[in-house]
Amino acid sequence: MIRLIPFILLLIISCAPKICPKPKEILNRVFQKPPEKAKLYGYVKTPILRIPFVFEKNGYDEKIKTPGDVVIFDTSLLCFQGVCFELPELPSNFIYGYFPGDYRIKECNQTVTLVSRDGKEIILEGKRLKAVKYKNLEIIYGEKSKEGYYREISVKLGGQEIKILIEGII
């Protein structure tokens, strides 16, 4: 009988529903607000090109500059190969993985999915931002630097994909 008690406890614990913290508590552990001033450099990688860029942020003024303006990422627009898309956040929010707002929990197990009123989905794995989805835009996050920006960001828009690889701070 005594040997049966640990087995019963294990069975009860494994079948119990997971209690998920409130969305604000989850986001406070994951999100870090971008700095007021930043200057980063890296590459925008497309299937056939690797384009160097410089990202500059000074207060609310934000720009990603590339030679010949092949890719333009300015305030709330992403333009690539002559097509522009309106973005739901500022470029620095994408680079630093910061998506403030009011969210509700859609899914809470190994992966936590949060959804905002405007349809933005934030996908977290543990204490790590994995992806953000909004309409036909999907952003997948790689490794985070000690300075708070993500070193690799994949942006899928419609049928196209570009990767933003950030090398460091200028």
From Swiss-Prot:
Record protein name field: Uncharacterized protein aq_780
Species for this entry: Aquifex aeolicus (strain VF5)
